[in-house]
Amino acid sequence: MIIEIAENELLRDEFVMRGGTCLHKIHLKEPRRYSEDLDYVRRTNTGIKPYITELRAVADRVGLAVSNVDRSGSMVHVTFGADATGGGRIRIKVETNIAETDFFNKTIEIEHEVDSRWWSGKAKIPTFVLDEMMSTKTRALYQRRKGRDLFDLWLALTSEDVSPEEIVAGLRHSMNESIFTYPQLRQNLFDKLADAGFRTDIEALIVAMPDEYNVENAADLVMEKLGRLLENAPPLEEIADGRWRSMT
């Protein structure tokens, strides 16, 4: 479905991919966790109906049928389904943000290839530089209660060539005046560390849990690398090595 969307001229020129599936299937050499939803953001503010029509046509070519279309605020959700060969149902959801058309960086293209006994193809996928992907991921970590966001940030900060300064600059760009401060992030993350659902969210999604991954250590890294760059942040020595947790 990712490749079919990227090969469609109308959709390729309008939809830019981001989110967990994009991170693990497109940006990383080896996917580290499972993500079923395909997240996109639009380049323009024109009507959405022609693109939904085109999505239906693309889905039909790969044997999927639209089971639901829903719009909630700035998000349009299109759910596709099909009967799996081994029984059960295949479900894919395309989530499109129709409001955020002002990007921080120029978009890029990354070639993606699928070669299996069922289907093969390749295409250049429109997406964002990894720093901007992590800006969105940092916002998601703050706004929702999903441990997968912390895992993805930890993974990028420890294994990829990302710039904390660029991540926070992109965050400021996307959130404008509503960007959270260091004390707000500190309290937000501290509360989430005490939530069992947040801590175990990643377990059902992970391909193989890295031995070095630890929820507390991941939160410490986020505060040291990104939190320190936010408004009202104390000196790094008051944040590092988990000391930010004792100040809450």
Place the predicted regions along the sequence by residue.
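Structured mid-to-C-terminal alpha-helical surface segments
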Residues: 1-15, 26-34, 38, 42-248
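Glycine-rich beta-strand-to-loop/alpha-helix junction loops that act as flexible
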Residues: 17-22
